[in-house]
Design a protein with these regions (language model features):
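Short, conserved beta-strand element in jelly-roll/cupin
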Residues: 33-49
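Conserved short histidine dyad/triad with adjacent acidic residue
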Residues: 16-34, 68
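Extreme N-terminal tail/first-helix region
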Residues: 1-11
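A generic "binding-loop/recognition-motif" signal
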Residues: 25, 35, 54, 70-71, ...
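Ligand-binding loop in jelly-roll beta-barrel domains
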Residues: 68-88
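Short histidine-centered beta-strand/loop micro-motifs
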Residues: 7-9, 28-34, 51, 75-76
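Short acidic-glycine-tyrosine-enriched beta hairpin
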Residues: 52-69
């Protein structure tokens, strides 16, 4: 699927705000929360998400969803990461 198709899919699921985000290699986001539910679909590279003490690495085509107000952290892979974000 193209980035546009992935964004449209998230919008059909009720994610009113969708956009493409790209992080540099090895970018880290320490523990934080969002006031809304977020969905992330990896387009290229990889992203490791840690939530509730569990870490999982996502690659191209993978999706991870983070509930509103869930404490989590993220680390990008050695090639960075490009991903679609949906917020609702």
């Amino acid at each position: 699927m193209t980035e546009r198709e992935l964004m449209a899919r998230l919008q059909r699921e009720g994610f009113a705000h969708t956009y493409v985000w790209q992080d540099d290699p090895n970018t880290e986001y320490g523990e934080h929360t969002h006031g809304m539910e977020t969905a992330h679909i990896v387009v290229s590279g990889e992203l490791t998400l840690t939530m509730n003490g569990n870490s999982h690495t996502y690659g191209p085509g993978d999706r991870c969803d983070v509930p509103a107000n869930a404490v989590h952290s993220a680390r990008m892979g050695p090639r960075g990461c490009r991903y679609i974000i949906g917020e609702r």
